[in-house]
């Protein structure tokens, strides 16, 4: 079985480990003008398809990916909030309030929530998308608590080769199969252990 679909021949280093034939496809970006895409970058659905509608989905880095949003409401006393997203991408969770002094709790990428703001702590189960957060101070009455995350269903694949997205409108993507050890990246940095587990759940090892 030939696992390569509509691939354009890469000119440099590849992400795919071809000892186990991967499934690779050419995927359109949602629009031009993004930063450079590195080999091994985890790619996700963007906010829209390309103008020609030749692609059924777009691909972009996590920073520009389409995110799912859930909300809760403060009552002035409650500090603990729970959200259920379904599978989410490790490292993508953020929870904020619209208090006069906004509170923000971010994803540490290891199943815990916190970040640098010290606004609160919590946990996230990436496979189920269950999120529990406890703020250090209760959000004010009627103020909104907004949780955002990249849904697991929005994952497209791994960039098989590097490109300048300001000049190119698409990228060769590893959709399934083995990739070279240490090549996977999330927003330009080496993928974490939880992100590698996420890739494994989606058929990329």
Which residues fall in each region the model found?
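Surface-exposed, low-hydrophobicity beta-strand/loop segments enriched in small/polar/acidic residues
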Residues: 1-66, 71, 132-134, 140, ...
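Extended beta-strand solenoid/passenger and fiber regions
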Residues: 24, 59-121, 126-150, 184
């Amino acid at each position: 079985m030939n696992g390569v679909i509509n691939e354009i021949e890469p000119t440099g280093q590849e992400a795919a480990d071809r000892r186990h034939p991967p499934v690779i496809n050419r995927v359109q970006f949602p629009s031009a003008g993004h930063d450079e895409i590195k080999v091994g970058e985890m790619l996700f659905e963007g906010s829209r398809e390309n103008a020609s509608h030749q692609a059924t989905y777009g691909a972009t880095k996590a920073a520009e990916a389409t995110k799912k949003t859930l909300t809760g409401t403060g009552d002035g006393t409650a500090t603990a909030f729970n959200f259920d997203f379904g599978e989410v991408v490790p490292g993508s969770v953020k929870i904020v309030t619209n208090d006069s002094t906004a509170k923000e709790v971010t994803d540490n990428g290891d199943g815990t929530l916190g970040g640098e703001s010290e606004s609160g702590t919590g946990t996230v189960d990436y496979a189920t998308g269950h999120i529990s957060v406890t703020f250090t101070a209760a959000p004010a009455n009627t103020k909104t608590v907004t949780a955002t995350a990249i849904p697991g269903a929005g994952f497209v694949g791994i960039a098989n080769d590097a490109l300048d997205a300001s000049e190119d409108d698409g990228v060769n993507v590893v959709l399934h199969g083995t990739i070279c050890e240490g090549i996977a990246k999330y927003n330009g940095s080496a993928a974490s252990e939880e992100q590698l587990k996420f890739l494994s759940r989606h058929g990329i090892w």
